[in-house]
Amino acid sequence: MSLASGADVAWAANPAKPLSDKKFDTLAAAALEAMKQKAAELNIQGVAVVSYAEGDNVLGWSSKMAVVGHLTDPKASASGNNLLGIAYAKSAEMARTLKDSGTSGTAPMTGEFGWQGGVMFKTGSGYLIVAFSGGKSEDDVQVSKAGLEVMKKGL
């Protein structure tokens, strides 16, 4: 195998370091704040979750969440909706598929819904996984993207 440029050689010799707990906490707080602001802009409430998983496969993660107005939506269905559960289900689907929630093209497994609203990004050391639940899927995606962009800029 030949490496064509000095940048490639530097990357191969110095793989990206995983996010420290302190760095993740800082990025997560900023991302959750951005998600709260975007949700307010869209006039929706729900739950925001941001996670970081080290490595090429998701075998564990660190996560933070924030209630953005409501933890549950009692009027959404006969039994209500646990918005935290839905946000984590979106995150779990992304952990399995390594694709944004609802976009894998495969049938959801038990415990997954296949709903859009979660986005992810492969870093040099792992994955950023961001999800929101509480609005329409397209609004949830916008809120999640707002959080992800803040995290990406902070890397």
Question: Model segments located where?
Answer:
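Flexible, solvent-exposed loop/hinge segments and secondary-structure transition points
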Residues: S2-K122, G126-L155
